[in-house]
Amino acid sequence: MAKDSHTATHDRGLPADLSAPAFVDGWKMRALVVGVIFSLIAAGLAFADGSLDHVLRAWVLGMMLTFGWSVGGLALLMVQYCSGGKWGLLLRRPLEAMARSLPLVLVYWIVVALNLKRLYLWAQFKSDIDTTAALKVGFINELQKHCMDFKRPMLNTSMFWAVSLVCFAIWFLYAYRLTSLGLKRDADSPANTPYWIKKFENIAGPGIVVYALTMTAAVIYWVMSMDPTWFSSVYGLLFLVGQGYSVLALGIIVAIALSKAEPFKTILRQTEQHDLGKMTFAFVMLNIYLGFAQFLIIWSGNLPEEIPWYLDRIRGHWGIIITLDFIFHWLIPFSLLLSRDIKRNKKRLTLVCQWMIFAKAFDLFWLIEPNFKDAARNLHFSWGILEYVAVPVAMVSFWIAFFCTRLKARPLVQTNDPHVAEILEPEHVHA
């Protein structure tokens, strides 16, 4: 018969040293080495391919993946401040480190912004005269001309820079404000905790709305506008959910890895790990729901303005990729996270989360590459296509090194928090 037993004594407490373990420096060095190696591989592939086109396309993938962690980490931090919960005590410092890694994402974005004509069809045409000439020689079709002419007040270089920089400024402001106040909260008296809880709620509540709007604007310009004919009312929401999907995966990996030493060895209990696994499962479900709902509505509607976007990603061997995307991105994580044992097992949950990050990158490949004329409905091998491995791995590696620097800069646990005492209580398990 099952019985309750304590897994720890009542005298547990936080260790005196709350700084990140020394092995985080090892993570940083390994990430830098991997980044350099894959940068060299990317350069070699570009030489073999004879073009930088795939380098820049893969660069967008790497930028969107790291952007999702930085801005998505900021968003999840704000959600935690509004909702509360013990899980926030585990992820708060890693989420802050993600948000404070945003400067590197800005550097990545600048590379994209300086190469608009190579990545965005609309950037090649500044007026109706230009699109008319391109239509006559067969470079674009009627739908592309109509959409670019109609959307020109929005899809132009000046607006791309202006909207993007305003979004970055807002994200930087929120990241700085929330992370700096976090340090002030730790330095304050526990008696003022209710004041700090209210203050963070007042900042984070409106911040979530601002995040949703600015993130949607950013992904419309950075990814959606690669095909100027495409429009979707849930595109921003798909990326919002996708960011939650990948941020939780990375956050769990970091938390479990940190639990090999103090202070996370003390505070990461099976209960909170299980809770994080359930949250991740929820994002997996929401992710496939939105993606499939959009596909079903557009496919059944079969409108000539909408259906080509999916045909570009299904025909010409792309059907293999979309099938694998469904399996990688949803079916495998869904099936594995159904298991309670996997969610409570550190090694297995880490493997699932690592797979989810790979699946997210694979999904971004399916979203980005078919936007280009040489790839739409024509999946084929070239040296350039391998850039989708080399370039993102290098960019993610450098981002991880930057993230580790940010993580080392502050104590890993926010001590002035009412959940500290709760998370240090003995954990009850069923024997």
Give the location of each predicted region.
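Hydrophobic alpha-helical membrane-insertion segments
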Residues: 100-119, 282-291, 351-359
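N-terminal regions that are enriched for targeting/export leaders
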Residues: 2-70, 155, 422-431
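Juxtamembrane/interface segments at transmembrane-helix termini
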Residues: 47-55, 60, 79-92, 119-121, ...
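Hydrophobic cores of alpha-helical transmembrane segments in multi-pass inner/ER membrane proteins
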Residues: 70-77, 106-111, 164-176, 241-256, ...
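Long, contiguous internal "core" modules enriched in hydrophobic/ aromatic residues
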Residues: 22-45, 132-136, 150-325, 342, ...
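Non-cytosolic membrane-interface motifs at loop->transmembrane helix junctions
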Residues: 56-62, 91-93, 228-240, 311, ...
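TerminUS-proximal long segments
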Residues: 3-7, 139-147, 328-333, 339-431
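Transmembrane-helix bundle segments that line or gate the permeation/cavity pathway
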Residues: 3, 53-56, 63-187, 207
